Amino acid sequence: MIICNDSYPSVLDKIADMLTKAEVELVFVSNEEMREINRDKRGMDKTTDVLSFPLTYVPHFPIGSIVINTDLASSKALELGHSTDDEIALLFTHGLLHILGFDHENDDGEMRRKEISIMEHMGLPKSLIVRNGC
């Protein structure tokens, strides 16, 4: 189940249900808000597309928060030729996998393979899969 500060693409519910039965918080922010969060939480004074913040497991509470930069999601979607909702689906998947313990920095491609599998299973555009930096 997703707890969100705004409306969101319905495919996110399907992705969340595929990966976990726990609740996850989803927050949409602007470039400037994301820059502030990234600076305050990670010491990096720049914007980014998605951040995830896992929480210690407590029954009936969210397992973490996913923060998505809608400004960057929109511009990346335009650049790659798919919808903003599809870009948000990839960013949500990426953030949720981090919350669930995946780490693309150290997993020899396991997280990326999982993202590709989910994107294909959901019938999302190949432009989400064929890209750098995720």
From Swiss-Prot:
* GO BP terms in the entry: rRNA processing
- Cited InterPro entries: MetalPrtase_cat_dom_sf_prd, YbeY, YbeY_CS
A single Gene Ontology CC annotation of this entry is: cytoplasm
Record-linked SUPFAM superfamilies = Metalloproteases ('zincins'), catalytic domain
Q: Which GO terms describe its molecular function?
A: metalloendopeptidase activity; RNA endonuclease activity; zinc ion binding
Q: Which domain of life is it from?
A: Bacteria
**Which keywords has UniProt assigned to this entry?**
Cytoplasm, Endonuclease, Hydrolase, Metal-binding, Nuclease, Ribosome biogenesis, rRNA processing, Zinc
Enzyme Commission no = 3.1.-.-
KW RNA-binding (keyword) present:
no
How is the cofactor bound, as the UniProt entry phrases it? Answer: Binds 1 zinc ion.
Q: Where in the cell is it found?
A: Cytoplasm
Please tell me whether the keyword Metal-binding is annotated for this protein: yes
Which cofactors go with this protein? Zn(2+)
Record-annotated residues binding Zn(2+)?
H94, H98, H104
Tell me, in one coarse class, where this protein mainly resides. Answer: cytoplasm
Cross-referenced Pfam families, in alphabetical order? YbeY (PF02130)
What this protein is reported to do is described as:
Single strand-specific metallo-endoribonuclease involved in late-stage 70S ribosome quality control and in maturation of the 3' terminus of the 16S rRNA.
Family, as annotated:
Belongs to the endoribonuclease YbeY family.
What protein name applies here?
Endoribonuclease YbeY
Query: Which organism does this record belong to?
Result: Campylobacter fetus subsp. fetus (strain 82-40)
